[in-house]
């Protein structure tokens, strides 16, 4: 069932959305003080569309700070995912995928996390190591559906887990999405995006029916099985694949984080957050064995950084 959600916004975080204060959602970079005097940004100020509790929006948020940008270098616009603002025809004209982060520079739109971060690096006051070769492969891997950090947030493997998530933010979040989709789909401005709305209404509606206890029993059980498989995928990746990407200390890019680390750090943080944990060591319950030493070391390298502390000051997401 969850495969119906292909294109499901890779920038949201239901488990922590309700706890995000408005100031966190709308002023993601305002407390940052640049130590650099200049960047190579164009005369037209870039606009970054983001949301404070988003897994993939955290990638440019951390990168922004690591790259030495000042608080006025890029205009920040919040797209409220709880209210489905990413599904408005106006936003679809900017990004037909309705995903965050999105960056616009004049008439040019960058509509994937990879494109946004690549632009920020290319125009930054402070150089960092760009991903090449195997590092690009790592970025591509963690953006694949079988270890999707967004489905990790919304999955349920039992009635008990489903109830706990529904009683939190998930049911309200899915309902808000569905309401926005159905509202926008019937407007004249939405006509050119009719296929998009049809697919999204069906996909989000299927997941909503599970959490609203309106899905047939067989559909619910299939969802549970997909959820169990997803966590097995995550477990295998963290235990057996991720350590092979990581150094004994520091970051994949070296002593300081590089392009690959911006993506990988946000992915790992989201997976930890979906379990309700606050530290990587707490993953042991889900992993059913100790967290690999390299993963624990990588987590410490990130959680000691000022950029990471600022972005996740209100909690992991």
Positions of predicted regions on the chain:
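GST-like fold's C-terminal all-alpha helical module
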Residues: 151-290, 294-296
